[in-house]
Amino acid sequence: METESEQNSNSTNGSSSSGGSSRPQIAQMSLYERQAVQALQALQRQPNAAQYFHQFMLQQQLSNAQLHSLAAVQQATIAASRQASSPNTSTTQQQTTTTQASINLATTSAAQLISRSQSVSSPSATTLTQSVLLGNTTSPPLNQSQAQMYLRPQLGNLLQVNRTLGRNVPLASQLILMPNGAVAAVQQEVPSAQSPGVHADADQVQNLAVRNQQASAQGPQMQGSTQKAIPPGASPVSSLSQASSQALAVAQASSGATNQSLNLSQAGGGSGNSIPGSMGPGGGGQAHGGLGQLPSSGMGGGSCPRKGTGVVQPLPAAQTVTVSQGSQTEAESAAAKKAEADGSGQQNVGMNLTRTATPAPSQTLISSATYTQIQPHSLIQQQQQIHLQQKQVVIQQQIAIHHQQQFQHRQSQLLHTATHLQLAQQQQQQQQQQQQQQQPQATTLTAPQPPQVPPTQQVPPSQSQQQAQTLVVQPMLQSSPLSLPPDAAPKPPIPIQSKPPVAPIKPPQLGAAKMSAAQQPPPHIPVQVVGTRQPGTAQAQALGLAQLAAAVPTSRGMPGTVQSGQAHLASSPPSSQAPGALQECPPTLAPGMTLAPVQGTAHVVKGGATTSSPVVAQVPAAFYMQSVHLPGKPQTLAVKRKADSEEERDDVSTLGSMLPAKASPVAESPKVMDEKSSLGEKAESVANVNANTPSSELVALTPAPSVPPPTLAMVSRQMGDSKPPQAIVKPQILTHIIEGFVIQEGAEPFPVGCSQLLKESEKPLQTGLPTGLTENQSGGPLGVDSPSAELDKKANLLKCEYCGKYAPAEQFRGSKRFCSMTCAKRYNVSCSHQFRLKRKKMKEFQEANYARVRRRGPRRSSSDIARAKIQGKCHRGQEDSSRGSDNSSYDEALSPTSPGPLSVRAGHGERDLGNPNTAPPTPELHGINPVFLSSNPSRWSVEEVYEFIASLQGCQEIAEEFRSQEIDGQALLLLKEEHLMSAMNIKLGPALKICAKINVLKET
């Protein structure tokens, strides 16, 4: 963006040096015009869009000669003003802020913008302007017809401006409906220079710069906020009232599922020489301290009103949105300018609230970039401010009437908000400035603060988070003392945040007044931050909470004067307390986290200080948690926070130890506070928790004003620690259901040890009592079974014979012996391996016996062994039937006549046989004479083979074939079914039987 802006400025300087250079720009303008027309035709035309387009055509009625001469003069004046820009900060430099890299579409005229986008050496600027026109087209709009209705007028407007290259007739303020579907109305800004005789240039064309955030480095540059200079003759009061008139808040529509379409339009005007108390009655203006600016000696009596308008747009795809506060970015850039001009060496760093750490791909930002008219020969003249203010108010009211009827209540609420938010900002910034200068040793700031401070007050450290606020902000500000309602909504406990009590918040459409019924009569000053749910990682959430912990200064033993000490700050005007304060933002939370800090601050008077400038401790008064209920993801927030709390606890505890202990006179270490919190307090807190629980939230603490703040903090912490692991939803564990088996993927690839199912079944037994206590009292939806149900479950568990794991009986199929097919197959493989070892030993034993039989004649031992083998075959059918249901695929793949499965089955038979001699021999089952079994078949002759085959049942005719084929003992053992069927023409049935008998001989 910076290089693009430099290219634009350089190309403009080069092309506008002569008056005749506007001719090639016009030739190239037609190309851009054709592109814009194509973009227009891409949208579906509607009658409303045609009428809007026709109106803009009628409003442009300057002749071509006047336009070309005006364009040439304007190019010359722009080049001159750029050459005149120097470190001596003049009003010309502030009028043409194109030298500022942080402001992309700067305060330039429409002719300047068009010439920049159409110069020969800047083709990228054309792309930039097209992106301004088209917006984020990758995300589908919520309402296509509205998107076309608001985009087409804007396209037509820019087309006409391209044709004219100048403008002297007023253009109506425009709306762009983003393709994401939110209507954003941005009010007009003051033109930088005005000729007294020309009234038509008072109205500015509002072109909303719509850009995609492509990198986090572009975050500060996304603000289209511009800087205007008021000549020394202007009065500060009028500029302040003008800024307050600019503070018209903007409501926006979102018809998506998120239910919260809120934005924050913040405008601040400040004068360089006005006192801090010179606020307008509307409170919309800011003193210069509110913007974090040092008064510039080079400015003289000039005053600089500034206005940054950030319109936040909720995305339909549950993306987080950045709150853009242009006044802060503008303050930063203006401070850098003034530092160059003054040379004072003071490093003034404004609060930049527009940095986005990780912008979403479809995240868009709407910023107002107003192209002011630079008049020829009258660059620095008096502005007609009252006229401009009236024009602005009328245009803004027209915007509200035409496009925001259904959001009138939100507009009034935000009008109230934008006024009070600046009061709170000024007060907080003043205190942060004081603490940074006067107590640098006690501060643990996350970012530098502006150093300008009055030396009257001293404030203990407070932290201000300068990260991007990736949440939609709905401020609800009322000057009143704070009540202390606690909340134990299902969020991870933040150990260093011990004193801020928290309370549940209703959804944003309920309004600011509908808080909990048990609260104190004066309501809070909460800024409700409602974030849309987005599947974020646990690391992002841990990072957000670590930043939150860093942003919350804690004093462990907060005295009981929190309620009474807060009223003087929240209700006091800024003129009595501080010139300005900067808003303390909540840190960048993960998209799934919803945090709502109270905008006011609670003050505790230390050490009996009763002077006019008391020593106060700035602490966040309350933090609100609201669980966002999106369709389809009702209750996953609590589980994620619970899962992340263990990771955050270590990081947060280290941050807590770094915080200064002298924040309050009764500060104690976290360990002491933990030891002091007793079981009685815990029980009392549990009773308070469950007394008044809303059903829409999981667990929400209701107010318990009688308990002091340290007790409340420790109670919420103990409640977070004592909550049992809720295993209902496991977002980090992928669960598969394959063929009836529930497979859960864990973090560890292959757990070694006892069964994970057994561990998970034992966990609820161990935590059964606290689970029952908490969940039964709260009546939350996430209940855990009682120990009796767990015992019943365990009674239904079966033990696998192979792996030894306990699993539910539903997982055991067939014979109920193995928990899965894998165990059944592995069991068979292991049994066959063991049987091979046994058979090898048995063969050696048989060889020895056979040698003895040859020498001494037949003995009983060898025949007993053979009978034992045969007896094992009797049980083969039972073994196979029990194994068949578990391992049918394994058995079907193997032939029953091959030696492999027979050896396996023989192994099963031998394993199942307790004593081989107990059962009588049944050789007739197999039809083999024991005489043949007692000898070695490999040494048989042809006649012995013939006798063997003839002894088999039904094979007397076939025996002759064996004799004719001269098959001896060795050939017999090598026979297969194919040999018998092909060579001897034996049918399949007898061939299979003969091969089965041969296999029995092989095994013996």
Swiss-Prot record:
It is found in: Nucleus. Residues 279-303 have a biased composition (Gly residues). GO terms for cellular component: nuclear body; nucleoplasm; nucleus; PcG protein complex; PRC1 complex; sex chromatin. It comes from the Eukaryota. Residues 1-22, 432-447, 459-482, 566-583 have a biased composition (Low complexity). Zn(2+) binds at residues 800, 803, 819, 823. Residues 1-24, 212-241, 261-355, 432-512, 556-589, 636-672, 848-928 are annotated as: Disordered. Residues 448-458, 483-495 have a biased composition (Pro residues). InterPro entries: PcG_chromatin_remod_factors, SAM, SAM/pointed_sf, Znf_FCS, Znf_FCS_sf. GO terms for molecular function: chromatin binding; DNA binding; histone binding; zinc ion binding. Residues 212-228, 319-329, 344-355 have a biased composition (Polar residues). The keyword Nucleotide-binding does not apply. The modification Phosphothreonine is found at residue 922. GO terms for biological process: cellular response to leukemia inhibitory factor; cellular response to retinoic acid; chromatin remodeling; negative regulation of DNA-templated transcription. There is a cross-link at residue 763 (Glycyl lysine isopeptide (Lys-Gly) (interchain with G-Cter in SUMO2)). Its main location: nucleus. A zinc finger (FCS-type) spans 791-825. Gene3D superfamilies: 3.30.60.160, Transcription Factor, Ets-1. Residues 940-1004 form the SAM domain. The keyword Repressor does not apply. Keywords: Developmental protein, Disease variant, DNA-binding, Isopeptide bond, Metal-binding, Nucleus, Phosphoprotein, Primary microcephaly, Ubl conjugation, Zinc, Zinc-finger. The modification Phosphoserine is found at residues 645, 898. The hPRC-H complex purification reported by PubMed:12167701 probably presents a mixture of different PRC1-like complexes. Homodimer. Component of a PRC1-like complex. Interacts with RNF2 and CBX7. Interacts with PHC2, PHC2 and BMI1. PANTHER family: POLYCOMB GROUP PROTEIN, POLYHOMEOTIC-LIKE PROTEIN 1. This is Polyhomeotic-like protein 1. It comes from Homo sapiens.
